[in-house]
Each structure stands twice: as C-alpha cells, then as structure tokens.
Amino acid sequence: MKMMEPLFLGLKKMDEKKIIHNDIKPINIVLHDGVFKYIDFGLAGMLSKKNHFKQRSLDELSSDRIYIYYPIDYLLYYATSSKLDEEVERINTKYERRNYDILNIIHMIFGRNSGLNVIQEVVQQIKNKKINQTTMIRGIDIYSLGILIPLLFLRSEVNYLLKEESDLINEFYFLFSLMTSPLPKDRITASDAYKQFKQLLNKYSQKRVKKVSLKKKKRS
C-alpha cells in the first residue's frame, strides 16, 4: 500500500489545481523509483471546461459498454431524459451494456444494492437535478482510483476472502468504498481520501514496528 501513496497525493494535488486526469486505470499508472505514478493525461481537463467532460461522457454513452473506471453519475449526467429511461430499461430487459456484470460484483463487494438499483438511484437524482455538475466532475478521479484495487481482484470471492483475512485490507476497502460511493455528494473528497490513506499507513506501519520489536525480544 505504501507504493500507492503518490497516487493519493497526486489526486489531492490535481484537485487543488482543479485538474481532472479523467482516465485513471492500470495502464495509465507506472512504477517509478519504487512507487506508482500517473501517466497519459490525454483525456485530462480543467474543472472549468465543462464541455470537455460532457463530450467524453456522451462518447462513452454512445458505446456498448459501461466504462468501468467511470462513476455512473458521470456516464449518465448529460443524457436526455428519454435516454436515461432507456438505460434503465436496457438492464430490466437484460440487454445491458458490456461490463454490467463487473459493476454488479463491485457493488456486491462493498455491500451495496445491485447495479440496477444503483443506476436507478443515479437516474432519479439526475432527473430531479440533485447532482451538482462541479461536484460530479471533481469526483471522477476519486472514483477511478477507489475502484482500482477491487478490480484487480475481480472475482468477488477473492475480494471477500481478502477482507475477512486482514484488518488492514478491511480498513483500506472501507476507504475504497467511500471513494466509490454511487452518488457524488456522498463520495469522499480527494483531500480527505489522502488524509485517511496516510492515517491507515501510519497505523499499520506502527503495528509492524511493534511486531518486529517483539520478535527481537523473544530471540534475545
């Protein structure tokens, strides 16, 4: 987890400068000098350039997939009312987009309702104008980073085993859950995500030091 610290710090710094990477995923992260760093800012944009994010959202909406690294609120925010109804209907009639099954698994890992329920809730919030556009855009990268590790262990039983086996994993997964909340108003901020990540790192590094000290005492 220590290797991921620059990713959380980078998230915080980008947010402070109102820059959205807009494409955080495994192939856009490299290992450099023992830590992970972001690369490929080809889809990045300034928070103020709303049309940039609108076009990216509509491009994905016109495809046949759910871009799994994007939150549903971003994918659907700029859709027409009839298009929103169509998306719900697609899932109801089993003509869902590619990756819908993955979305379902991720929500199960975090103890949430099905992907359909999440989409229905987001659609209702968009229709009722309950989602703030700026808050939604600021939440894109937070969601993308939060979903990374659970996706690496895609099979749900592997994720469940990891969480049951370790308090450390369980606490980090709780942070990932906050980062991937379906509604942007409930999603943790980049600054708070970094703060909580650092707190967890410090907590478990101290525990490791104590364990090492105890082992040395036993040997002596």
Task: Kindly label every feature range from the protein language model.
Residues 167-181:
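Conserved C-terminal C-lobe helix
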Residues 37, 41-160:
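C-lobe/activation-segment region of protein kinase-like
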Residues 7-14:
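Conserved hydrophobic alpha-helix
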Residues 3-4:
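Activation segment signature within eukaryotic-like protein kinase domains
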Residues 182-208:
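Terminal C-lobe "cap" of eukaryotic-type protein kinase domains
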Residues 15-32:
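Catalytic-loop of the protein kinase fold
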Residues 205-220:
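Regulatory extensions appended to serine/threonine kinase catalytic cores
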